[in-house]
Amino acid sequence: MPFEHVTVLLHEAIALLDIKPEGTYVDATLGGGGHTGEILKQLTTGTLYSFDQDDTAIQYNAEQYADEIAAGKLVIIHKNFRTLTSALADYGVTAVDGIVYDLGVSSVQFDDGQRGFSYKYDAELDMRMDQRQALTAKTIVNEWPFNELMRVLSRYGEDRFPKQIARKIEQHRENAPINTTFELVDIIKEAIPAPARRKGGHPAKRSFQAFRIAVNDELGALEDSLTQALELLATDGKISVITFQSLEDRLVKQMFREKSSAPELPAGLPVLPGQFEADYELLTRKPISPSTEEMAINHRAESAKLRGIRRK
């Protein structure tokens, strides 16, 4: 299907990177190619390495940017961004000037009813960002034990009723496998008390987020990738990260804060000024949010937050 993904905070995210025309850059989440296209406009002799694990994104951008690929200006890497260091090493790259992340599910993945990401479309329970992997939402819902289901719903969905939903799933799958998104939606609705169903948006929203994060190990992959990204940065290199939900934002905020904080030293220890300064500095003391105008155009922008960090 054609890509119709509207990139959120596009110019703000790229502005934080302060692109050098001759630099080496990474788009960790190629998606619809919005950030990739913007970076390419600003490169002259530089090179951009763009990662994605989604077949559709890879095929679409390979066609869109065929000339840039042929010229060696763009390299598309069909891998999860948690392989950042090893994948770039395959191209002889050991340091980069900037990395951009645009996290979460792309509009194309979400709106493709057959991918099973959305509670709005009836489809097989899939939710894989990388169609090559074996684990699907169907496997988790039908095979993972009660305690694991409860942990996933509580931790990744911050669900108010994880025990009730996990128990209801367990009861239903004893009779027959749970195969589709709508079957799961009905089970979740059945598990949640009626007063709670009537407020706070769609009752299955948090549960679907939880299973999607579990299927793709999104938080684990992000932590792995950011750890590598921070080490890959050259002097004056920068990272900008756009998040769309609190779990991701909390992780990014915590990692950036730790890296940009000087180590705590015993009182009275004789040290020279600057001797124990942090190697990184925050580019955003508070996250950047979309403008009112952008949110009016794209309702999915409402929860977006942009954070940045620089290596000194």
UniProtKB/Swiss-Prot annotation:
Major subcellular site: cytoplasm
GO CC annotations on file: cytoplasm
EC number: 2.1.1.199
Pfam families the UniProt entry points to: Methyltransf_5 (PF01795)
Compartmental location: Cytoplasm
Family from the record: Belongs to the methyltransferase superfamily. RsmH family.
Top-level taxon of the source organism: Bacteria
Record protein name field: Ribosomal RNA small subunit methyltransferase H
Keywords from the named record: Cytoplasm, Methyltransferase, rRNA processing, S-adenosyl-L-methionine, Transferase
Enzyme class, spelled out: transferase
One of the record's GO molecular function terms: rRNA (cytosine-N4-)-methyltransferase activity
Catalytic activity: cytidine(1402) in 16S rRNA + S-adenosyl-L-methionine = N(4)-methylcytidine(1402) in 16S rRNA + S-adenosyl-L-homocysteine + H(+)
Protein residues bound to S-adenosyl-L-methionine: 33-35, 52, 81, 102, 109
